């Protein structure tokens, strides 16, 4: 199941992302965050990844935002 959820993200990383300049505001890119969240939390990781994408905009804070060990849709402020 996790492999099926990760496949579209890998497709994006391989074929779509290289066409555009880097724009993620976080140290762990949003696509890598999504993959790690899915690996840790399964389907809930998709929700976490989508919430992360919504947080990634020009007016958000930058920096580290690792995948938390528990399910959360909020930014992991570890290290701040």
Curated annotation (Swiss-Prot):
Residues 61-80 are annotated as: Disordered. Residues 62-80 have a biased composition (Basic and acidic residues). It is found in: Cell membrane. It comes from the Bacteria. The keyword rRNA processing does not apply. The keyword Repeat does not apply. Keywords: Cell membrane, Membrane. One of its GO terms (cellular component) is plasma membrane. InterPro entries: Membr_insert_effic_factor_YidD (IPR002696). It holds the Pfam family YidD. It is a peripheral membrane protein. Belongs to the UPF0161 family. HAMAP family: UPF0161_YidD (MF_00386). Could be involved in insertion of integral membrane proteins into the membrane. This is Putative membrane protein insertion efficiency factor. It comes from Streptococcus pneumoniae (strain Hungary19A-6). The lineage of its organism: Bacteria, Bacillati, Bacillota, Bacilli, Lactobacillales.
């Amino acid at each position: 199941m996790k492999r099926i959820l990760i496949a579209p993200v890998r497709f994006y990383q391989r074929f779509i992302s290289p066409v555009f300049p880097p724009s993620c505001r976080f140290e762990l890119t949003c696509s890598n965050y999504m993959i790690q969240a899915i690996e840790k939390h399964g389907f809930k990781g998709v929700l976490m990844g989508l919430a992360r994408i919504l947080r990634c905009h020009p007016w958000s804070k930058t920096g580290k935002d690792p995948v938390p060990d528990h399910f959360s849709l909020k930014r992991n402020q570890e290290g701040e």
